[in-house]
Design a protein with these regions (language model features):
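Nucleotide-activated sugar donor-binding and catalytic core shared by glycosyltransferases
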Residues: 1-434
Length: 434
């Protein structure tokens, strides 16, 4: 009865949304190209019984990389189909996951569409990153006796409240999942409270600690800096994954800081690239020099060329490597009540990390990171300003903070192997797949 009600409502909403889908298909090429896949119409390039991994967006795609590489190392002949929800996640997967044999958009969660996609893919297992719960996808995959594993599972306090409110529904969805591999004990407690079978839950850690990035040589670092228009004498303040309401604060702070730090450059990376025009309006209003990264001319960063005050990072999938250029890093989504973003990424480069008061999405990690001396949390604009001023003048404090953060990161690695060992029994026979 619950699924019948859901499907009636979903069908009704899908009909209502069809004019919008048609309009977007006409005006937006990327949406037009993705729509057939979302409707379950695509050609499969994989053989029978591939591993189906679903990673909703960019963050989930990146955190899936260590596990996917480990699976391919053990089962080199296994074919992998990866689906994403967002176009940015899709592009990121195609760029950073050569191990995936096919990258598609996840089917719209209508029973007819999902059934069509399952018959096309014919997976031997479905692995879902974090907590992307599509009711019909879960129900129909399980109906085919295909095991479903939720890996790197997490439930934020905000999401938990929503799940609890609709517990009667999500409890029915969770019964189709074979195994829950959760990040923390708190995540395990929450998923059980929502309705997961305690016997099917494990705490195995967080794959985000196991992400790997290239170790850049000094020459490569200089080349990357030059592409950003940097000459080597600048201090660089990177604000990553920023949201509306934060850019005004950060640009204003940067203007103030430049009065005492004339060579300070702000690299601003909005979380959503469709907001770039909005951010540019703020920059014009603040009367600062700025440029999009992709508009910087070849050879930018020459000795006689001053870089712009603000560089807008307008490319996808480059933020984590760009962090390597930073003197100081601010993690966005935390000065406004968004819930924050992953504070671990800059730590791979031993960077000095700051974030605001709103870190609900990474509450446990942020608390433990602060306790380890690996990051600084500020209450708002004024404290952020004072901490930035202090750290810009104190190289030793920056180095100690970055080193402590890196040690914290290393201490919590190992989730990949633990998850793989839990999933491995479901992959028996994969070595024989051709």
């Amino acid at each position: 009865m619950i699924f019948l009600t859901y499907n009636i409502l979903f069908t009704f909403l899908l009909i209502l949304a069809s004019p919008y889908f048609l309009f977007r298909s006409l005006v937006q090429k990327t949406f037009r190209e993705a729509l057939p896949q979302r409707m379950g119409f695509f050609k499969t390039s994989s053989s029978e019984g591939p591993i189906w991994i679903h990673a909703a967006s960019v963050g989930e795609v990146f955190c899936s990389i260590p596990l996917l590489k480990r699976v391919k190392k053990e089962f080199s002949q296994a074919k992998i189909v990866l689906t994403t929800m967002t176009s940015t996640g899709n592009k990121t997967a195609k760029t950073h996951l050569p191990e995936a044999d096919q990258v598609l958009f996840v089917p719209i969660d209508h029973p007819v569409i999902v059934h069509r996609a399952i018959k096309k893919i014919q997976p031997s297992i479905l692995l879902i990153a974090e907590t992307e719960l599509w009711p019909n996808l879960l129900r129909l995959v399980a109906k085919e006796r295909i095991p479903i594993v939720l890996f790197n599972g997490r439930i934020s306090q905000k999401s938990f409240q929503r799940y609890v409110f609709f517990k009667f529904f999500f409890k029915e969805c969770l019964k189709y999942i074979s195994l829950f591999l959760m990040q923390t004990e708190e995540d395990r407690t929450r998923i059980i409270e929502i309705g997961a079978d305690p016997q099917k839950t494990r705490v195995v850690g967080n794959l985000k600690f196991d992400q790997t990035f290239p170790n850049f040589s000094q020459e490569e670092m200089e080349k990357m800096a030059k592409a950003m228009g940097l000459r080597g004498k600048e201090k660089v303040f990177i604000a990553g994954s920023t949201h509306s309401g934060e850019e005004e604060i950060l640009i204003s702070l940067h203007k103030e800081l430049k009065k005492t730090e004339p060579h300070l450059v702000l690299i601003l990376a909005p979380r959503h690239l469709e907001r770039l025009d909005e951010v540019e309006k703020i920059l014009r209003k603040e009367s600062v020099s700025w440029a999009r990264k992709t508009s910087l001319p070849p050879g930018a960063g020459g000795l006689d060329q001053k870089p712009p005050d603000v560089i807008l990072l307008d490319t996808m999938g480059e933020l984590m490597t760009t962090y390597s250029l930073g003197t100081l890093v601010f993690v966005g989504g935390s000065l406004v009540p968004i819930g924050g973003h992953n504070p671990l990424e800059p730590l791979f480069h031993k960077k000095c990390v700051l974030f605001g008061p709103y870190m609900l999405n990474f509450l446990e990690i942020s608390h433990r990171l602060i306790e380890a001396g690996g990051a600084i949390q500020v209450s708002g604009k004024e404290e952020l300003s004072s901490q930035l001023r202090r750290l810009l003048l104190d190289e030793l404090a920056r180095k100690e903070l970055g080193e402590s953060g890196y040690q914290f990161l290393q201490k919590h690695q190992g989730a990949t192997e633990r998850m793989f060992e839990e999933i491995k029994p479901y992959l028996s026979g994969m070595e024989n797949v051709k």
